[in-house]
From Swiss-Prot:
Its cofactor is Mg(2+). Belongs to the adenylosuccinate synthetase family. It catalyses: IMP + L-aspartate + GTP = N(6)-(1,2-dicarboxyethyl)-AMP + GDP + phosphate + 2 H(+). GO terms for biological process: 'de novo' AMP biosynthetic process; IMP metabolic process. This is Adenylosuccinate synthetase. The gene is purA. Pathway: Purine metabolism; AMP biosynthesis via de novo pathway; AMP from IMP: step 1/2.
Length: 430
């Protein structure tokens, strides 16, 4: 039995899809355990670029099981569209399994999400307006509708009718927006469910059976540790738990069956949406990194905010996710920058702190303490091993490992699969 969890160590968009796709080659099952179609991942497979939002990266390997876990919230319409997108490109999706316990996103969740973000004005969270938060709210309030409910029209109608009474009052009286009629949703969404019912099952059984049979299972996180609802920059976070601990809740696999946790980190830092970002750059270097790194959101198309690598953030990720390995991505983007900076600590009211503060007021007053390292000018996109990297690039990686306390086991120097390199296998048994 061998299992690996892939988590983002920053604010998402670290390149988890690429690393998951790379590690999928040696996995026999790949599972997502939280989030929804608010997170996009870009995968290049057999020379073709795919952009997915719901379906796990493992879908391209027809001999491997690809799982949408119970901890996810699934927009049935978006799922049907994504399946069609893959089918139109000739991708076989018969290896997909969808948890019957996953909750669904309905049109009222999306409308409430949009209305609430608009109402907040300057205090907005910066959500993708995909209905994720409201769907998780319903789940916590025990009024959510699960995929198993969607597949039974009588049950779906009963629950939908009950929820529409409450949601329409909220939309009409509080937000002053038009509500929904039962017939607006019932038949359309029931039909979506019928289109993917062949994939629906108890995925906890599927995953545990795979592990018990000695198979390799890969768990794919969405977003990142700093967007975790408990451990992130609350309230500027997502509504689920991207940290490694979310795996056990969102997949139905116990913690004793998790072997390694790979934290994916960019060689710099980015963020989409509002919220604190201590190392954010507002100068020409930030603009250069954004353009060279194509830093625009997969889901929203919004320009990402860009900053220097923050070891305080990644140390926090190491602690709360129990990272065993680090995968450093987009090293090539830093090529040509004369002097690189790594944030090693923060200054808060004149005092040096090395741990990430919980208070946003404190965080707003934090000033990054930087360590400068010489950059490199050599093109590294064609390297095939660690030894091929320029000395300054290797020193940069070594310093990140020292500051974060996590060994760098993988690094990537470009978007293609061949540009990802392994220093130490994360599939090791010890």
């Amino acid at each position: 039995m061998s299992s690996v969890v892939v988590v983002g160590t920053q604010w998402g968009d670290e390149g988890k899809g690429k690393i998951t796709d790379f590690l999928s080659e040696n996995a026999e099952a790949i599972a997502r355990y939280q989030g929804g179609n608010n997170a996009g991942h870009t995968i290049k497979f057999d020379g073709v670029t795919y952009k997915l939002h719901l379906i796990p990266s493992g879908i391209f390997y027809k001999e491997k099981i690809s799982v949408i876990g119970n901890g996810m919230v699934v927009d049935p319409k978006a799922l049907v569209e994504e399946l069609k997108y893959l089918h139109d490109k000739g991708v076989d999706t018969s290896n997909l399994r969808i948890s019957n316990r996953a909750h669904i996103i309905l049109p009222y969740h999306i409308r409430i999400d949009e209305a609430d973000e608009e109402r907040k004005g300057a205090n907005k969270i910066g959500t993708t307006k995909k209905g994720i938060g409201p769907a998780y709210m319903d789940k916590a309030a025990r009024v959510g509708i699960r995929i198993i409910d969607l597949l039974d029209k009588e049950t779906f109608k009963e629950k939908l009718e009950h929820n529409l009474g409450e949601k329409n009052r909220l939309l009409e009286r509080f937000y002053e927006l038009e509500g929904f009629k039962l017939e607006d949703i019932l038949d359309e969404y029931y039909e979506y469910g019928q289109q993917f019912k062949e994939y629906v099952c108890d995925t906890s059984v599927v995953l545990n059976d795979a592990l018990d049979d000695g198979k390799r299972v890969l768990f794919e996180g969405a977003q990142g540790v700093m967007l975790d609802i408990d451990q992130g920059t609350y309230p500027f976070v997502t509504s689920s738990n991207p940290i490694a601990g979310g795996v056990t809740i969102g997949s139905g696999v116990g913690p004793s069956k998790i072997n390694h946790v790979v934290g994916v980190a960019k060689a710099y830092t980015t963020r989409v949406g509002d919220g604190p970002f201590p190392t954010e750059l507002f100068d020409s270097i930030g603009d250069t990194i954004r353009e060279v790194g194509h830093e625009y959101g997969t889901t929203t198309g919004r320009p990402r905010r860009v900053g220097w690598f923050d070891s305080v953030v990644v140390r926090h990720a190491r602690r709360v996710s129990g990272l065993t390995d680090l995968s450093l991505t987009l090293l090539d983007v830093l090529t040509g920058i004369e002097t690189l900076k790594i944030c090693v600590a923060y200054k808060l009211d004149g005092k040096t702190i090395t741990e990430f503060p919980a208070s946003l007021k404190d965080l707003a007053r934090c000033e990054p303490v930087y360590e400068e390292l010489p950059g490199w000018t050599e093109d590294i996109t064609g390297v095939t091993s660690l030894d091929d990297l320029p000395v300054n690039c290797r020193h940069y990686m070594e310093r990140i490992a020292q500051l974060t306390g996590v060994q760098v086991s993988m690094f990537s120097v470009g978007p293609d699969r061949a540009q990802t390199h392994v220093i130490k296998s994360v599939w090791r048994l010890a």
